[in-house]
Amino acid sequence: MARLRLTLAYDGTDFAGWQIQAAGGGRTVQGCLEEALATLCGQPVRVHGAGRTDSGVHALAQVAHADVPEHRAGLPWGKALTALLPKDVAVTEARLVAPDFHSRFDATGKEYRYTLWTRPGHVLPWRRPYVWDVGRYGTLDVAAMEACAGLFVGEHDFAAFQNAGTDVHSTVRRVWDVSRLAGTGPDETVWRFHGEGFLKQMVRNLMGALVAVGRGKATAEDVATLLAAGDRRRAPGTAPAQGLCLHAVEYGAPGVAGLPGLGDKPAEPAGSTT
């Protein structure tokens, strides 16, 4: 068998998440990919993903691996798979790798981005599946949100920001950066969450806390107390799935990827008039 590494982009709107569900559980990215690989290989193929994105969450660069028969190794995998996959999934890179490569266990970092729609009034219809409409809450206190974001940087026990339903050995995670970027237009703001790894719905829970602070429903001191206490029951609500995108999965030296690239720029400091 030959090990194949895939980089995938997908629109999570109509998926029940990455991971295959029980019978009747809905359409999944993993399921679509395994069906396409089985067609090309003539046998069942198991796919392993770097992250298990939830229903409605998008990906720009999810990474997965699969073992394919040696006699099929020379196929133009990216083109062949994309031709078989539904229109809301694309293979952006495909290459053969060492047989011990593991998309999940070899990952040294991940970057997620969350997009907020900040203009009061209606969200543009074609943006609604990709943003959280916080404009309906009025103007957010961005300076307070940025001050709160600093609390999440470093190594912490994020038990208060993990949703139930996951059995993990430890809830301690190391986060390198939580920062605000310029959005794709004047009505949007993008937040970057960059770290070694994240707990179940942790990024959405962090975003929910930041918006609560921006709305004046909580303070940075409240969030600091919550982080120290580790009690999810006292935490603000979870941000909706559609604003979240898995932007990058990193391998090799930790923390060196996921930095601003082409088309990225930091947001203006809170209160800036430029």
UniProtKB/Swiss-Prot annotation:
Tell me which residues bind substrate.
112
Q: What is its EC number?
A: 5.4.99.12
Q: What UniProt keywords apply to this chain's record, in alphabetical order?
A: Isomerase, tRNA processing
Q: Which residues form the active site?
A: 54 (nucleophile)
One of the GO biological process terms: tRNA pseudouridine synthesis
**Keyword tRNA processing recorded:** yes
Gene3D superfamilies to which the protein is assigned, alphabetical: Pseudouridine synthase I, catalytic domain, C-terminal subdomain, Pseudouridine synthase I, catalytic domain, N-terminal subdomain
Q: Which residues form a coiled coil?
A: none
Q: Which reaction does it catalyse?
A: uridine(38/39/40) in tRNA = pseudouridine(38/39/40) in tRNA
UniProt KW Signal keyword? no
Molecular functions (GO terms): RNA binding; tRNA pseudouridine(38-40) synthase activity
Output the Pfam families linked to this UniProt entry.
PseudoU_synth_1 (PF01416)
Q: Describe its function.
A: Formation of pseudouridine at positions 38, 39 and 40 in the anticodon stem and loop of transfer RNAs.
Q: Which family does it belong to?
A: Belongs to the tRNA pseudouridine synthase TruA family.
Q: Describe its partners and assembly state.
A: Homodimer.
Record protein name field:
tRNA pseudouridine synthase A
Q: Which gene encodes it?
A: truA
